[in-house]
Regions:
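Helicase motor core with emphasis on the C-terminal RecA-like subdomain
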Residues: 1-24, 28-31, 35-57, 61-137, ...
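A general structural motif at alpha-helix termini
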Residues: 40, 283, 726-729, 744
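Short strand-loop junctions, especially beta-strand C-caps/beta-turns
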Residues: 51, 235, 303, 623-625, ...
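Extended Lys/Arg-rich polyanion-binding regions
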Residues: 367-370, 376-394, 401, 406-422, ...
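Terminal or standalone catalytic/regulatory effector modules within metabolic enzymes
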Residues: 537, 724-727
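Short cysteine clusters
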Residues: 716, 721-725
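Acidic, low-complexity intrinsically disordered tails
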Residues: 747-777
Length: 777
């Protein structure tokens, strides 16, 4: 529990706003609200990072309303949210405050569902436009002349949930915000940024990269917090030899019989969509035993149709739903009311996500309970043995790099379509520079490349003009790989019942799959893979399906290489490569799993083409002899396979700190017997089609990344491995931490440049050595 710290309303806050707040029962503001509002009224860019339900919305709403009062409604603001639901939720909140103030102002949501008739109205009359980064990128900025009044009077840009802006997506959004500032400046405005976020490890840096300038950080939560009881529950063992425990979903159902009731609301978080549907079915079927009705149990996840999601959100907020089972779809700050119990079925994979889920309960000072049910997964089991990790481990850092060469080039292309670029001569250096698109020294080089090589820019004196009819923003994906959704239809009625991203479709809506929505089941009869449509017939199924995939990495071309010597024997050299690879993900078969008993009642093959990805990869190869010698000496007996996989897991965790991306932007494949190299090979590949330059950055700084990984091991307080380093001992092996440390030491310090170090790419047929021969084959 935490006591509240209330401060007086900031000096300068309009008396009309103060009167409205006092009429609502406010005697002042929480300390963090008051400081954030005071900084905003002083003209500063502000980032407030406090937990869910700490009143962040008021901290950015009041400065916007103050500016509207000062300008008699002429000021305009743009609010960015990561989801449509959040935009619509906040629009309702803001319109309520407008009514309380008695002003004739208007706020509108602008997204893909906004009718054309409304779009013209909101462009002309909307003091507040609530939208998302995708609509800003493809809808507003390229058509800025239609939004001239908005940009000319733009006083504030509000960005909510900025912790969701990381990796490739966050880097692209930072580029979009550069374009926004550039256009606003063109119309004579210089908007201030008001941002909110969950707690971050590098909040100040993250906010500055998004805003393009320093921000004032408000990070001390001074809102009230009721008592919150935490529990970590480890299901009983059913097979000690195999380390298997009772199924977490079954245990969640059993725990619900005790925790769920008609007098309070509960939320259950699952990490997979299938788990959401299975648990929703279980809880609906035992609703009577919990004192509630089946219709008071709802599922909620991505893929539900928008109307269904809005219905569930409203029923949650108004108390008609007693239990909701969800994925991370309800982690974000949409207002669903004050919940009392949170049950996490498994660790969600990050501290940020864990605390977002736990933060859904205990709002507004009430007492609450949060329980995590562990699975047999090694990470979950580690957290059962070391629950202090959940509270003591530092939050993850967020990586954003708007100057990544590929991302910067794409955003410059979009910006050139919107407005010409102009350069000037730097008085100190004599260099030609462009000053309105961030600090990168490569902006002029990129513009010249687009002029001389690509031909879609024309340079006249100091100005670059876009010369083609192309619409570049339409071809630039903010997420790197734009989702290509599959729509699922009821085969009898023809109605759409859901949607799913293409990557997930091969395991969820293949022919024979059981597709579930809130406990109801459809058997997929036909999957039109090319046209992205699946058709299912409603059935009363007593089983669900679980599909398996295989991932294969094949080398296409190697471009750069470093060779290092571990000993005087060239056979024990190790090599680091950068090249192009082909990654295939193939759905191979699916199992039919009986509800409740989890009995496997059959398996069938899946007949779908593989998902294919041509991308860049960083490759580490070591001879079998070297790996065996390193791991079997110094009184160390370590499993080579576990150690090799643990090294890959550690590098995947550490690399984003150098590449300014998310861990999810990288894929890893650890092979003890690579078909390309005939020796152990570790692949770290860019998960975006064609690659976006992450691998080149990794290759150029591999020794720094390896050294940082070794430092992580040395400073980690665990004894034999944990989720923060190489993974739990059950996953990395009992000697995994020590083995990976020794391997890194030899790779960094023990390795020395071999005679063939820093080789240029060799033509096929002229290479020497086992690795090159294998590649030729």
């Amino acid at each position: 529990a935490r006591d509240v710290d209330v401060l007086p309303f900031p000096d300068g806050l309009d008396a009309r706003l103060v009167d409205v707040l006092r009429g609502q029962g406010y005697e002042g503001l929480y300390g963090h609200q008051a400081r954030a509002i005071a900084a905003a009224l002083d003209g500063q860019d502000v980032l407030i990072t406090t937990p869910t339900a700490s009143g962040k919305t008021l901290a950015y709403t009041l400065p916007v309303m103050q500016k509207l009062l000062e300008t008699k409604g002429r000021a305009r603001s743009l609010w960015l949210f990561p989801t449509k639901a959040l935009s619509q939720d906040q629009s309702k909140v803001f319109n309520t405050r407008i009514e309380e103030l008695g002003e004739d102002w208007h706020s509108y949501t602008y997204d893909g569902d906004t009718p054309p008739s409304v779009r013209r109205t909101l462009r002309e009359r909307g003091q507040v436009i609530l939208t998302n980064p995708w609509m800003l990128h493809q809808g507003i900025l390229p058509n800025h002349s239609k939004w001239a009044d908005l940009f000319a009077n733009l006083s504030h840009v509000v960005i909510d949930e900025v912790h969701t802006l990381s990796g490739v997506f966050g880097s692209n959004v930072a580029g979009v915000l550069r374009r926004l500032r550039r256009i606003a400046n063109h119309y004579g405005a210089d908007p201030k940024f008001l941002m909110s976020s969950a707690t971050l490890r590098n909040a100040q840096e993250h906010g500055a990269l998004l805003a393009g300038r320093e921000v004032t950080l408000i990070d001390q939560d001074q809102s009230p917090s009721g008592e919150r009881i935490f529990g970590v529950y480890n299901p009983p063992m059913v097979n000690p030899v195999a380390g298997l425990r009772k199924n977490a979903l079954e245990e969640a159902r059993r725990i619900a019989l005790t925790l769920v009731g008609p007098s309070h609301q509960s939320i259950f978080f699952c990490n997979r969509r299938t788990s959401v549907e299975v648990l929703t079915r279980y809880l609906k079927e035992c609703a009577g035993r919990m004192g509630i009705k089946p219709e008071e149990v709802r599922g909620y996840r991505g893929g539900y149709l928008p109307g269904l999601r809005r219905e569930i959100e409203t029923d949650l907020k108004e108390g008609r739903v007693k239990v909701v089972v969800t994925t991370n779809a309800l982690e974000l700050g949409i207002d669903i009311g004050s919940l009392d119990v949170a049950v996490l079925v498994g660790y969600p994979g990050s501290q940020a996500s864990f605390w977002q889920r736990v933060g859904r309960v205990g709002r507004r000072g009430s007492s609450s309970l949060a329980v995590m049910i562990s699975r047999s997964d090694p990470v979950d089991q580690y957290l059962c043995a070391h629950p202090e990790y959940l509270f003591d481990a530092p939050r993850e850092r967020l990586g954003v790099d708007p100057d990544n060469p590929v991302i910067l080039s794409e955003q410059i292309k979009c910006a050139a379509f919107e407005l010409p670029f102009r350069s000037e001569i730097d008085a100190a250096t004599g260099d030609e520079v462009v000053r309105d698109f961030g600090p990168s020294p490569h902006v002029v080089d990129i513009l010249d490349y687009f002029t001389e090589e690509s031909g879609f820019l024309l340079k006249s004196k100091d100005t670059w003009y876009f010369t083609q009819d192309a619409y570049p923003a339409g071809d630039v994906s903010l997420a790197g790989n734009e989702p290509d959704n599959v729509v699922i239809f009821d085969a009898e009625s023809g109605d759409a019942i859901g949607e799913i991203d293409r990557e997930g479709s091969i395991t969820a809506v293949h022919e024979g799959a059981i597709y579930q929505v809130e406990g109801e089941t459809w058997k997929i009869e036909r999957f039109d893979y090319e046209n992205r449509r699946a058709y299912g017939r409603k059935v009363a199924s007593d089983y669900f399906t679980d599909a398996h995939t295989e991932v294969e990495v094949r080398v296409l071309r190697l471009e750069e290489r470093h060779r290092r010597g571990l000993t005087d024997d060239p056979a024990e050299d190790f090599s680091i490569w950068r090249g192009e690879v082909h990654v295939t993900t193939l759905a191979t078969l699916y199992k039919k799993i009986r509800f409740y008993t989890r009995e496997n009642v059959g398996a069938e093959d899946i007949h779908l083409p593989p998902e294919e990805l041509d991308t860049d990869a960083f490759v580490l190869t070591v001879s079998n002899e070297s790996l065996a010698r390193l791991l079997e000496g110094e009184d160390l007996i370590a499993d080579r396979g576990s150690t090799w996989h643990a090294l890959g897991a550690l590098l995947k965790r550490v690399a984003p700190l150098f590449l300014r991306c998310k861990s999810a932007d990288l894929g890893v494949s650890a092979q003890l017997a690579s078909g390309n190299f005939k020796r152990p090979a570790l692949f770290l590949f860019d998960r975006h089609h064609g690659g976006i330059g992450l691998v080149k950055l990794f290759f150029d700084a591999w020794d720094e990344v390896f050294s940082a990984a070794l430092e992580v091991l040395r400073h980690c307080e665990c004894s034999h491995g944990c989720p923060a380093c190489v993974g739990p001992p059950e996953e990395a092996g009992p000697e995994g931490k020590r083995a990976v440390g020794l391997l890194l030491e030899h790779l960094i310090a023990g390795g020395r440049p071999a005679a063939t170090s820093d080789l240029e790419p060799e033509p096929a047929g002229e290479a020497a050595g086992t690795e090159e021969e294998a590649l030729r084959g």
